[in-house]
Amino acid sequence: MVYKTQYHYTIGIIFMLCVGGLKGVGSQFLNVPGSVNEIKYGTQNALIYFPENRMGRSSLSVSHNDWYGDFSVISVGIASPIFGGQGLLRFKYGGFENLELRDEVPSDDPLSFYSAFGLDVAGGFQFQFNDIQTAVLLRMVQLRIHTHSSSGLSGNISMLKPINRDWKIGFSLAHFGFMDSYINEEPALPVSGNLLVEHRTVFQELQNTFSFSGGFIPSLDNYIFSANNAVLWRHLNLSLASHITKNVTHVSGSISFLIGMYQVQYGFQLGDNQLGISQVLELIVLLP
């Protein structure tokens, strides 16, 4: 039990702090998926928070993510038509509870207990103007580890424009904003500029959609490329994706099916970091 707790403690702290040192505080929590779409596409494209099958319909979503190292994430969101577009409000919470603080000497008695958590409150709006699909997302972030905390704002804006019947191209500016000082330094968010490409083909009842996003993250001296292919047949959707960064490659997949007013989604992600498999289960209720 002692060594299992120490393992979870190590994974949690490394996961939230050590990517780029303290300047990476917040970057990992922002990128932890809170929904199946985030595990499929990543978090660089704001448009993925506004799925097409919910345009014109209000919906309520609840999801649970078993992330690496028993880092548990819960997300609740509501989307609704507003001002000719679509509005979104979402809450995401993730963290560890009852972590044990220990010294370097092994012992059954911890020095103290504490928690590490992150809270992300996101609000956004999607609209279309002159064939340009635009999504804007603003996120308020609160992080706390032991007795230290940091809060800030993060924004995403994405635009996508058709260039012919099957292709769309656009760009996304992701995670720009600021964080309060954490301990003695001011953390930097993982700001990135990304190219977006989408190709869609339809054959009878089958629809195939290929999506690509790629960009550079200066604050982490890193890059991220994501490619996703999804096949839709009637009310069943299957997808497979690959996400590549400088140090880690992830593969993710999902299955989604719609039954009446209920949409059930399952997604998974695994990588060559050998931390296990992340799994997300999500229920979406389409409201009248």
Where are these regions (language model features)?
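Bacterial N-terminal signal peptides
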Residues: I11-V19
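Accessible peptide chain termini
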Residues: M1-V2, L17
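Bacterial N-terminal signal peptides that target proteins for export
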Residues: V2-I11
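Subset of outer-membrane beta-barrel
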Residues: G20-P288
